[in-house]
Amino acid sequence: MKPHPKIIDRIIEGIRQSRTICVVGHVRPDGDCVGSQLGLTLALRNEGKKVVCWNEDPIPQKYDFLDPEGIIQKPKRGREFDCVIATDAASSERLGSVGRCVAHRKLLINIDHHESNTRYGELNWVSAREPSTGELIFRLLKIAKWPITKRIADCLFTAVSTDTGSFQYPTTRPGTYHVAAELVSRGANLAKICDEVYQSYPVSRARLLRHIYSHFRLTHQDQIAYFWLKKADLARAGSDSNDTEGLIDHIRAIAPVVVACVFEQLEPELTRISLRSKSEKVNVNEIAAQFGGGGHPAAAGARIPGKPLSVQRRVIAAVKKALDSAG
């Protein structure tokens, strides 16, 4: 087996010395978060550990097939754990209320691939060169020699596939295809995953798409595309925030667009922004960092206080500056 970072051995030893474990993930979980949380939880349960899996928010409907028993649950106060493992969360703040509910623990392990990770654990395995946290969990299970069952393979394939944009994003490396191939060979149901994740969505999402195509805006010689989502928009669509994952890709795909942005109003004076870049010269992680957020060079976000139009002006100005600097 190829050499691996020593931190992995320390993580495996920490897990082996723990009996009670809580696996947690970031708020508004995406496919990488859901797949990583579930895949690791299932593997640890197979090893005889007493494991719970917590997330502040419900998982998006399209990932329900991965969790038919409802393993991922809302956090509960007053619990104590030998070990807490955070997956795909760049900071403790990204854990939301879960972070406060897991304060009574002996060890915090942080496994993530975000460039902006704050190294908030006692043991931190952060590899920004990996396109997904799911790939890190796969490596962990392989090195620990913990069995990868068909169900775990489904979870990890979903994690890897979704965070690489179905293996289309520039972060995808040759090794990613090898990981995906091994997961399929271990039983990942490719047809089922593709049908559930990519080939079907609820009517409420179709209504949101209609809203987006009717209201998106282009600026800066059509290099910037953006749209707003307000609570009233979600209510009219019969939708909620769980239906918003991936909506930004529809405006990102417009040919002249270099940077796409979604403004989602969470409260009257709190806006969540999501940024996507198609150019290696425009690092949206750096843009998001200006507003207290972070992520990856090609995909990042932040939560920004302030009046909506003020937030929009500041963010669009920062994007324009980045585009102008890129030439």
Question: Which stretches of residues belong to each language-model region?
Answer:
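Hydrophobic helix-and-loop "lid/oligomerization" segment in the mid-to-C-terminal part
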Residues: 2-27, 33-64, 80-81, 162-327
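Solvent-exposed alpha-helices and their adjacent loops that cap or buttress functional pockets
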Residues: 15, 76-79, 100-103, 117-118, ...
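Generic enzyme active-site microenvironment
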Residues: 24, 28, 86, 110-111, ...
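Glycine-rich, phosphate-binding/catalytic loops in enzymes
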Residues: 40-41, 101-104, 126-127, 178
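Structural recognition of alpha->loop->beta junctions
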Residues: 65-71, 129, 142
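Conserved beta-strand scaffold positions in the cores of enzyme catalytic domains, especially
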Residues: 108-110, 124-125, 224-226, 262
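Short alpha-helices
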Residues: 111-179
